From Swiss-Prot:
Catalytic activity: (6R)-5,10-methylene-5,6,7,8-tetrahydrofolate + glycine + H2O = (6S)-5,6,7,8-tetrahydrofolate + L-serine
Single GO term (MF): pyridoxal phosphate binding
Gene of this entry: glyA
Modified residues (N6-(pyridoxal phosphate)lysine): K229
Keywords: Amino-acid biosynthesis, Cytoplasm, One-carbon metabolism, Pyridoxal phosphate, Transferase
Annotated residues for binding of (6S)-5,6,7,8-tetrahydrofolate: L121, G125, H126, L127
Name of the protein: Serine hydroxymethyltransferase
Upper lineage: Bacteria, Pseudomonadati, Pseudomonadota, Betaproteobacteria, Rhodocyclales
Length: 416
């Protein structure tokens, strides 16, 4: 029999110490990685519940195990809330990750050797959209589209490629693209060439739920997403689809890719979907965009750095560091030493290797969750530029660390 007195700190102090150290890092550093966010206490409570004990292969009302009457309620809540949030015909909340959701789409609609078309990873796409080392690039014939001279999606070239190659699937979505995507235009060309139109909205899902970014659901055959990032839920994946594709997608997830779903994570997803339907969440997403725009403006117009695509229309943007003679890898490290967390990122036509890069990616979701507004966003942008202007100056790094500490103390992630 278990005892509530057997806390993690008591049972495994070594692991507890590592978790506490990570908690301090999250509180004491400004998080600007665009794919990261902080979840609510309610989301964590659901994910840490006894639902982790239950096996539930199958779907609500059709399980391969007994005793699923309560997890059926949990999963159906998540499904219904998700469909309502995005206006979808059908939804699957079981994918353990965005990558597995993407694999399910490929399994449902294509066979190895078929042609798929997605955005080039080198120009802002995602590795699961056809990167050569990923399953999507190894199993399928990949045609990649990219950006034009303005560093915006080259829709005309994309359409020409689609007509030439007639892919089985056309993918819209990105991991490092700051602008709005014209999903309606993608849908038109997909219909013209007879392709399944799939949108990966992982980065933009929270903005879409709040109405601040175009909703792909009315236009796409299938839409995938993670549940973290801007959606501010637990780490996991989801799939939205038109009614006629529900059976194919559900079969691809189970039994195609996964066995028993993680019902404790699905419960946490359900909480996040409920939170995302509130006015407070809409206000949050409005602030996310405002903060990103302020940082891009300050870094670009006031501090002389080049912003890829010239602006942001979302939560994220890329900074070209070549004028500072510093690589993305070096910038990530030195900013990290100043307690500002970013990630190195390739820029279009990057001369550096992918693990070095000429740029960094900056995102505003996590900093906005802790309460930062345009005032703090402007301060943070100047702190970033100060570090990039003098990456070897210990006094500058110490001063910036101090300023970061003051901001973090004023805006704790998890207050009382």
């Amino acid at each position: 029999m278990f005892s509530s007195q057997d806390t993690l700190a008591k049972v495994d102090p070594e692991l507890w110490s590592a978790i506490q150290a990570e908690n301090r890092r999250q509180e004491d550093h400004i998080e600007l990685i665009a794919s990261e966010n902080y979840v609510s206490h309610a989301v964590m409570e659901a994910q840490g519940s006894q639902l982790t004990n239950k096996y539930a292969e199958g779907y609500p009302g059709k399980r391969y195990y007994g005793g699923c009457e309560h997890v059926d309620v949990v999963e159906q809540l998540a499904i219904d809330r998700l469909k309502k949030l995005f206006g979808a015909d059908a939804a699957n909340v079981q994918p353990n990750s965005g990558s597995q959701a993407n694999q399910a789409v490929l399994m449902a609609f294509a066979k190895p050797g078929d042609t798929i078309m997605g955005m080039s990873l080198a120009e802002g796409g995602h590795l699961t959209h056809g990167m050569p080392l990923n399953m999507s690039g190894k199993w399928f014939n990949v045609v990649a589209y990219g950006l034009d001279e303005k560093e915006e999606i080259n829709y005309a070239a994309m359409e020409a490629l689609a007509r030439e190659h007639k892919p089985k699937i056309i993918i819209a979505g990105a991991s490092a693209y700051a602008l709005r995507i014209d999903f309606e235009r993608f849908a038109r060309i997909a219909r013209e060439v007879g392709a399944i139109f799939w949108v990966d909205m992982a980065h933009y899902a929270g903005l879409i739920a709040a109405g601040y970014y175009p909703n792909p659901v009315p236009h796409a055959d299938v839409v995938t997403s993670t549940t973290h990032k801007t959606l501010r839920g637990p780490r996991g994946g989801i799939i939205l689809m038109k009614a006629e594709h529900e059976k194919a997608i559900n079969s691809a997830i189970f039994p195609g890719l996964q066995g028993g779903p993680l019902e404790h994570v699905i419960a946490a997803k359900a909480v996040a979907f409920k939170e995302a339907a509130t006015p407070a969440f809409r206000d949050y997403q409005e602030q996310v965009i405002a903060n990103a725009r302020v940082m891009a403006r300050v870094l670009g117009e006031e501090r002389g750095l080049r912003i890829v695509s010239g602006r942001t229309e979302s939560h994220v943007f890329l900074v070209d560091l070549r004028s500072k003679n510093i690589t993305g890898k070096e910038a990530e490290a030195v900013l990290g030493s100043a307690h500002i967390t970013v990630n190195k990122n390739s820029i279009p036509n990057d001369p550096q290797k992918p693990f070095v890069t000429s740029g960094i990616r900056i995102g505003s979701p996590a900093m906005t969750t802790r309460g930062f507004t345009e005032i703090e966003a402007e301060q943070i942008a100047h702190l970033i530029a100060d570090v990039l202007d003098a990456p070897q100056d210990a006094a500058v790094l110490e001063r910036v660390r101090g300023k970061v500490g003051e901001l973090c103390a004023k805006f704790p992630v998890y207050g009382s």
